[in-house]
Structures are given as C-alpha cells and as structure tokens.
C-alpha cells in the first residue's frame, strides 16, 4: 500500500518495556496514584510493583462553606499486583524538569 | 459505509486509516473521565498507538476542566479509558 512500513511497528507496550526495573508513576481509577518499581507487566497492564507508595486523593465539600477540602492518604506496600483494568496512565516518575 | 469520513483531510476513510495517519502528529486525547491530555508544545506528538487505542505520548500535559494539572515526560494511556483522539491543526499557538 503506502511506501514505507516498518517491519515491527512499535506499540505503546514496547515502550513500557523500556521502564522495566525502573521506578514509574501509575495513575489508577478512583483517584489513586502509585509510585513504585516496575517488575513485570502484561498486555492488560496487570503489573507487579515493588516498594510502592499509594496516594489516594479525596475531595470533600463542606456543607456550609462549600469549600473543597482536598485530602491525600498515603500508604506503602512492599510488593503489589495491580489489576490492569484499573490503570489509566503509566509514566516515568515526575521529575523537576529543567 | 462508503462516504463516511470523507470530510476528513485527504486519505483517511476508516478508523484504522486514521490511526495509521496520526503517528507523529500533535493530538488531544480525551478520556472517559473527562480529563484530557495534550502534547506540551506543537512539536510534542503522539509517539505510537495500537489497535486497543493504547497510546504513548511525549511531554504530555494533563488538563482537568481546562486547567493544567500535571506534566509527564512520557505517558502511556490504557486504551479502554480513551474517549477520543483528535488531531490538532498546526496554526499559531494560542497563548496558554
């Protein structure tokens, strides 16, 4: 068909493979975030993470003042299996970019 | 289904053609949750995607309710969360 086609088109999953054994940031449903070391993953984005910190963000609205109170709860987990259907986004950890 | 999509620029006729044509182009990705992701500048583009609409993008900015919330060096977005992928016209960037 068209002129050039790579023999192996790189998929997004190929690029996640580059992050194996690196620390990553994962955004999950239910306003949760994980930061941990990626040990393994599959095409469903099931993942095994080590030395994980989970952050849960909740927003409460005060009935009287209607102000939004943003709270974060953190916990650490040594070894974690993440089911892929809850994953929204995967990224290298946010760095202070120059 | 002939004729559907002929308004789209040039050669794309099917969704599969669209997905082939957008690699390397600046895009806006909107998720089911309403959050959207854009390349941080016009040169920042969609790196690749697959048939499940899993997406890899460089230098991604996350917008919630139109407000910039986060920036990511690289972002992989799981396809089931994607509502749409839209290309962005390369006009003079409006001030942000």
From Swiss-Prot, chain A:
GO biological process: deadenylation-dependent decapping of nuclear-transcribed mRNA; mRNA splicing, via spliceosome
Domain Sm: 11-96
Localisation per UniProt entry: Cytoplasm; Nucleus
Keyword Acetylation in annotation: yes
Keywords for this protein: Acetylation, Cytoplasm, mRNA processing, mRNA splicing, Nucleus, Ribonucleoprotein, RNA-binding, Spliceosome
Residues in coiled coil: none
GO MF annotations, alphabetized: RNA binding
UniProt cross-references to InterPro entries, sorted A to Z: Lsm3, LSM_dom_sf, Sm, Sm-like_LSM3, Sm_dom_euk/arc
The protein's assembly and partners: Component of the heptameric LSM1-LSM7 complex that forms a seven-membered ring structure with a donut shape. The LSM subunits are arranged in the order LSM1, LSM2, LSM3, LSM6, LSM5, LSM7 and LSM4. Component of the heptameric LSM2-LSM8 complex that forms a seven-membered ring structure with a donut shape. The LSM subunits are arranged in the order LSM8, LSM2, LSM3, LSM6, LSM5, LSM7 and LSM4. LSM3B subunit interacts only with its two neighboring subunits, LSM2 and LSM6A or LSM6B.
Function: Component of LSM protein complexes, which are involved in RNA processing. Component of the cytoplasmic LSM1-LSM7 complex which is involved in mRNA degradation by promoting decapping and leading to accurate 5'-3' mRNA decay. The cytoplasmic LSM1-LSM7 complex regulates developmental gene expression by the decapping of specific development-related transcripts. Component of the nuclear LSM2-LSM8 complex which is involved splicing nuclear mRNAs.
Similarity comment text for this entry: Belongs to the snRNP Sm proteins family.
Protein name (database record): Sm-like protein LSM3B
Species this protein is from: Arabidopsis thaliana (Mouse-ear cress)
Source lineage: Eukaryota, Viridiplantae, Streptophyta, Embryophyta, Tracheophyta
């Amino acid at each position: 068909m068209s002129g050039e086609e790579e023999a192996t088109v790189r998929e997004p999953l190929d690029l996640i493979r580059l992050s194996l054994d690196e620390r990553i940031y994962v955004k999950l449903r239910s306003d949760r975030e994980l930061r941990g070391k990626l040990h393994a993953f599959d095409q469903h984005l099931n993942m095994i993470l080590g030395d994980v910190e989970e952050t849960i963000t909740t927003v409460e609205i005060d009935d009287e003042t209607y102000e939004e109170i943003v709270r974060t709860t953190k916990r650490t987990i040594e070894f974690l299996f993440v089911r892929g259907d809850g994953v929204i986004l995967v990224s290298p950890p946010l760095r202070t970019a120059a | 289904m002939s004729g559907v999509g002929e308004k789209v620029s040039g050669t794309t006729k099917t969704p599969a053609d669209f997905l082939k044509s957008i690699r390397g182009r600046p895009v806006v990705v909107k998720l089911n949750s309403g959050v959207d992701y854009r390349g941080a500048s016009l040169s920042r583009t969609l790196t690749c995607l697959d048939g499940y609409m899993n997406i890899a993008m460089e230098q991604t900015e996350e917008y919630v309710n139109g407000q910039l919330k986060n920036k990511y060096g690289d972002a992989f977005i799981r396809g089931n969360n994607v509502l749409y992928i839209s290309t962005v016209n390369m006009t003079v960037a409006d001030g942000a």
